[in-house]
């Protein structure tokens, strides 16, 4: 759902759905939680390989194209690296990424307000709080800011996935 206002910046939420592990119901529920817990205006975009069953309020776009193989036999959801591209469809500016399986129980405006001049904001990994790596179930970034990371990852996807 996109709601317009002349005085409030547009909040952009993105998610990614590929394969069959998570169906359209996850996208639809995530959209519902976001819409109940955000101050408009907002835009909700799902990058996906299958739009079947996704509610019409969700703006679906094709998965960003990558030219490197996905790692095998490693932990982590490396297809998310598609979102590190220089361009993300017609989305520009700051975005808040949410995994499809997150549960939202309160207002998420703070994620757009926290450290507004910091280019990338990651959540801490609560299962390992002393770890210096961020947790990417939720992170905010300007489109294109992670392109150098994608370039590095593309140089050795398997090796990097095994290391991290």
Question: Positions of the model-derived regions?
Answer:
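Glycosyltransferase catalytic domains, chiefly GT-A lineage
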Residues: 1-164
